Amino acid sequence: MMNSCTPNKKSSYSYEDLLASGRGELFGEDGPQLPAPTMLMMDRIVEMNETGGQFNKGYIEAELDIKPDLPFFGCHFIGDPVMPGCLGLDAMWQLVGFYLGWIGGKGKGRALGVGEVKFTGQILPSAKKVVYRIHMKRVINRKLVMGMADGEVEVDGRVIYTATDLKVGLFQDTSAF
């Protein structure tokens, strides 16, 4: 369910803010949480609003600074390091869930699916910055709060992943999920 009074509603968030979300401190103990490092896939959210994006239903832009010592580069793959594409997809789901908490949604966030994903590039240790852009399409506020969005992942100025119909739901009880 949605809560009309959302504390800490800002248009940008620092890394410390994102860590607070992972501890359940940003949107309250019954609000959605971001994962903790090493699964947190962003360093900051640089823009959030409820009326922007391609569909005028909300927009999120976040960034990840690429460093050669990020944990996944050491194992994916040995001698051929590349960020797993699924982590970029997960980052987009993380941001849709964060948006649902930002607008007052309550519950535990779970990815529910994606319409289509295209990978047309890769993120290597030599890259500098990844930018995630999420264009909210719809928010359903019933027994289940669900958000749907399109997103893209850009590395050093080039869009390399696109996803349509990213779906995230907020659940009061995940035992039957």
Swiss-Prot record:
Active-site residues (renumbered): H76
Question: GO molecular function: any one?
Answer: trans-2-decenoyl-acyl-carrier-protein isomerase activity
Matching CDD domains: FabA
What EC number(s) would the UniProt record show? 4.2.1.59, 5.3.3.14
- Catalysis: reaction(s): a (3R)-hydroxyacyl-[ACP] = a (2E)-enoyl-[ACP] + H2O; (3R)-hydroxydecanoyl-[ACP] = (2E)-decenoyl-[ACP] + H2O; (2E)-decenoyl-[ACP] = (3Z)-decenoyl-[ACP]
Pathway where this protein functions: Lipid metabolism; fatty acid biosynthesis
Q: Which Gene3D superfamilies match?
A: Hotdog Thioesterase
Q: Which residues cross the membrane?
A: none
Q: A GO term (biological process) for this protein?
A: unsaturated fatty acid biosynthetic process
The primary location reported for this protein is cytoplasm
Q: Which UniProt keywords apply?
A: Cytoplasm, Fatty acid biosynthesis, Fatty acid metabolism, Isomerase, Lipid biosynthesis, Lipid metabolism, Lyase
A GO cellular component annotation in the UniProt record: cytoplasm
Function comment? Necessary for the introduction of cis unsaturation into fatty acids. Catalyzes the dehydration of (3R)-3-hydroxydecanoyl-ACP to E-(2)-decenoyl-ACP and then its isomerization to Z-(3)-decenoyl-ACP. Can catalyze the dehydratase reaction for beta-hydroxyacyl-ACPs with saturated chain lengths up to 16:0, being most active on intermediate chain length.
Q: Give the quaternary structure.
A: Homodimer.
Q: Could you identify this protein by its name?
A: 3-hydroxydecanoyl-[acyl-carrier-protein] dehydratase
Q: Which organism encodes this protein?
A: Pasteurella multocida (strain Pm70)
The root-end lineage is: Bacteria, Pseudomonadati, Pseudomonadota, Gammaproteobacteria, Pasteurellales
